[in-house]
């Protein structure tokens, strides 16, 4: 009778785990994705969510590496993006790319009709000057500079609200319908912005310019939203009075907190300044002294 000893098997997969810089989790290599331009590596789920968020929010057309300290400042290639997002998300991304190309091309512009949105070609020889443009799709004639009805021989009225209009509309009824227009153009970069409902304080995703939806006045420096307390836009913000007061209380509290912090820290700064200056002078004097021979 022969007996054999049982020898346990220790064949364990000892493949190293890699750390994701976004979620700080550790994953095997097959669950990670490497960006080809910079060789930064992230878990596939985090990178997919990051890319989808930027595309859906329309924040970027060139999607950069999510690592803010990336030494090469790499960007994801189009084929890399296409491999990780759904088909409809990729179509939206390509649409954003096309809109960006038209925006940066001085020889192309968008038809201002909200029902058309075709791309119109400008005369390259006169691209720096206002010129009449006719849409190839809806035949609407408009000015390339102010986007209003074609006004050959007359100066552009730059102060008119920048709203979209339908074919056949003229300037008289455009002014009366400007508040109800669902689509307007950013007064700074001229891109289209659509508003369904809600707050009248708008921020352009393209240039980050804050403005009033009704009169297009800049709100970049109006932290307390005083604009909606007087004038034609009074009480048109779209929020209750209580929520506006709460917003202002928060803003004032933030500024007051910074002021109080500066007030408390100022005596310590005054006391520390002479010591810092003395240390700097001493270090400089030590550098200037010749080495002993």
Swiss-Prot record:
Q: What class of enzyme is it?
A: transferase
Q: Which UniProt keywords apply?
A: Membrane, Metal-binding, Repeat, Transferase, Transmembrane, Transmembrane helix, Ubl conjugation pathway, Zinc, Zinc-finger
Q: What is its EC number?
A: 2.3.2.31
**UniProt keyword Transferase, yes or no:** yes
Q: In which pathway does it act?
A: Protein modification; protein ubiquitination
ZnF (RING-type) spans are 20-70, 186-215
Task: List locations, semicolon-separated.
Answer: Membrane
Q: Where on this chain does Zn(2+) 2 bind?
A: 111, 116, 135, 138
The cross-references to PROSITE patterns, in alphabetical order and at most eight, read: TRIAD, ZF_RING_1, ZF_RING_2
List ligand-binding residues for Zn(2+) 4: 186, 189, 204, 207
What is a single Pfam family found in this protein's UniProt entry? IBR_1
**Catalytic residue positions:** 199
* Gene Ontology CC terms: cytoplasm; Golgi apparatus; membrane; ubiquitin ligase complex
Enzymatic reactions: [E2 ubiquitin-conjugating enzyme]-S-ubiquitinyl-L-cysteine + [acceptor protein]-L-lysine = [E2 ubiquitin-conjugating enzyme]-L-cysteine + [acceptor protein]-N(6)-ubiquitinyl-L-lysine
Tell me which residues bind Zn(2+) 5.
212, 215, 227, 233
Q: Which residues cross the membrane?
A: 251-271
Family that this chain belongs to = Belongs to the RBR family. RNF144 subfamily.
Its annotated function is as follows: E3 ubiquitin-protein ligase which accepts ubiquitin from E2 ubiquitin-conjugating enzymes ube2l3 and ube2l6 in the form of a thioester and then directly transfers the ubiquitin to targeted substrates.
| The protein, known as | Probable E3 ubiquitin-protein ligase RNF144A-B
Gene this protein is translated from? rnf144ab
């Amino acid at each position: 009778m022969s007996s054999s000893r049982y020898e346990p098997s220790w064949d364990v997969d000892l493949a190293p785990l890699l750390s994701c810089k976004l979620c700080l989790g550790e994953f095997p290599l097959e669950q990670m994705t490497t960006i080809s331009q910079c060789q930064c590596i992230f878990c596939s789920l985090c990178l997919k969510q990051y890319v989808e968020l930027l595309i859906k929010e329309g924040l970027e057309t060139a999607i950069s590496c999510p690592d803010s300290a990336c030494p090469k400042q790499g960007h994801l290639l189009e084929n890399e993006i296409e491999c990780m997002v759904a088909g409809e998300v990729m179509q939206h991304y390509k649409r954003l790319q096309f809109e960006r190309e038209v925006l940066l091309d001085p020889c192309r512009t968008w038809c201002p009709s909200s029902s058309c949105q075709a791309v119109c070609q400008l005369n390259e020889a006169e691209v720096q000057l206002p010129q009449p443009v006719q849409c190839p799709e809806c035949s609407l004639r408009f000015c390339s500079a102010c986007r209003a009805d074609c006004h050959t021989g007359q100066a552009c009225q730059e102060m008119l609200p920048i709203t979209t209009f339908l074919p056949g509309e003229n300037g008289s009824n455009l002014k009366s319908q400007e508040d109800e227009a669902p689509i307007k153009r950013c007064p700074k970069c001229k891109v289209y912005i659509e508003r369904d409902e809600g707050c009248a304080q708008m921020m352009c995703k393209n240039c980050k310019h804050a403005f009033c939806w009704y009169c297009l006045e800049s709100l970049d420096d109006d932290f307390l939203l005083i604009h909606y307390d007087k004038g034609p836009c009074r009480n048109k913000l779209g929020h209750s009075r209580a929520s506006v007061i709460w917003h202002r209380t928060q803003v004032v509290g933030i500024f007051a907190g910074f002021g109080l912090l500066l007030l408390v820290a100022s005596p310590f700064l005054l006391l520390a300044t002479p010591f810092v200056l003395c240390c700097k002078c001493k270090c400089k004097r030590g550098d200037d002294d010749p080495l002993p021979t």
